[in-house]
Amino acid sequence: MRKVSYKGHTIELASAKLRSGGWVARATVVIEEEKRTKKIPIFGRRRASFDSKREADSYALELSKLWVDGRIWGGNGRS
């Protein structure tokens, strides 16, 4: 599992191979707050698949960055 740091958050990329041979985008945003760790799962669209793990991870990373940006700017219902 590849880990990426983005604006103080850790993003764990964990795209999964489908039985059909394609790849589905998956990631986890890890938030360290006070003495707690929160893990927020990020999933690509259910029907979207990619030809390679690299493509799926790239899409999962972009979705994760959007989630983090929304959290920072209050777009996720959190401040």
What are the roles of these predicted feature ranges?
Residues 38:
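Double-stranded RNA-binding/processing signature
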Residues 41-79:
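Acidic, low-complexity intrinsically disordered segments
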Residues 17, 30, 34-35, 69, ...:
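Compositionally biased, intrinsically disordered low-complexity regions
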